[in-house]
Amino acid sequence: MTTSQKPAESCDIVMKGGITSGVVYPLAMVELAKKFRFANIGGTSAGAIAAAAAAAAEYGRPIQDAGFARLEKVPQEVGPNILSMFQPSPALTPLFNMFVAALRAKGKTERSFAMFAAAVRGYRLAALLGVAPGVIIAVIALLSTAWGWLCFGVLAAAVGLNAALAWRLLKAANTELPPNDYGLCPGIRQCGSAPDGFTDWLALLIQEAAGRKPGDPPLTFGDLDAPPDGAPAINLAMVTTSLMEERPYTLPMQNERFSFRISEWRKIFPKEVLDFLIANGRPFEVENDEQEEFFYFPERSSCR
């Protein structure tokens, strides 16, 4: 049986997180989809991403070039391009490069040197200003054959370099991370970058797996309640965590406990998704100049 045919049997599937999820889950779901229809789909962390893709694929199962045929291409897209999908905010690029250097290094010593080198490359001006006084002293001492001062200059350069980098990292933590919500990569394509960011790619994947065309509205939970060709409803549930409240939540929520702020969400979601939420959501009433900034999420029944 192919993945475009309607299986007689159904099954439920729950996927947990993990760094290999983007490669392992899609192919596993494609194989299962040959025999089963996914009725209830759940996921946490990276598994929630796979769950959303699986729900979209089940929705688009009868549509040519959509459904699980689209999902089958994911490993080839993610494997070679995963790093380019994670695009840091420009101000936080040095921190991101330090993080990547640490991941690529083998062993604690190599990791320390790799992160230090990435910090020097990322914060060149601070590094130059930190090392300059010591270098000047060392050069003058060398020309004067004042060996004691030469040692002092070399030591001052080393101390100055480390102090300057420490100051610059502290500045990044205090003044650059907070405006970016303490995250390095917003998810969408950043200025000057050619490939899509991870969120752009994921939004497109969901649309294509569901059989949606460019310009079509985003796939919603309401759509999953009434798939095409009279197929049974697809129940999708995902678990996320509110760090501020220190508690988990299950999506979709059934009440208006949360609203979203347009200016914040423009940084992390594709324009088509945010425009849909604004057009179908209800404004959150406030009594100041932020009247049009906050919206409740659209009602599930209205998004079909």
Regions found by a protein language model. Name each.
Residues 12-15, 42-44, 234-241:
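Extended hydrophobic secondary-structure segments that form protein cores and membrane-embedded regions
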Residues 6-12, 19-208, 250-268:
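Patatin-like phospholipase
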Residues 203-226, 234-235:
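Extended, Lys/Arg-enriched charged tracts that mediate electrostatic binding to polyanionic substrates
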Residues 233-236, 240-304:
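Alpha-helical segment proximal to the catalytic Tyr-Lys
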Residues 11-15, 69, 194, 215-223, ...:
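Internal catalytic domains of large membrane-associated glycosyltransferases
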Residues 43, 227-230:
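Short, charge-rich binding segments
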Residues 17-20, 244:
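Short polar catalytic/cofactor-binding loops
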Residues 1-5:
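A short, basic/flexible loop-to-alpha-helix module at the beginning of a structural domain
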